[in-house]
Amino acid sequence: MAELPLAPLKRILKRAGGERVSDDAVEALRDEVEDRALEMAQRAREYAKHADRKTVQREDVMAARREH
């Protein structure tokens, strides 16, 4: 999978208080974020499909977010 770049995720971990952050930690966060994003995207697609749309809109993503 590995779609997201590591550098921004490392910055997020540091901003959260991680003085030093291992590469393994960054990769683990990337994997988790990608998994959750894919799940949310799939739910958002279902909301769009239910509304007889092919285009996933912001409201679909927000509905999927509330569901989680």
Predicted regions mapped to residue ranges:
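Terminal helix-to-tail segments of small alpha-helical proteins
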Residues: 1-68
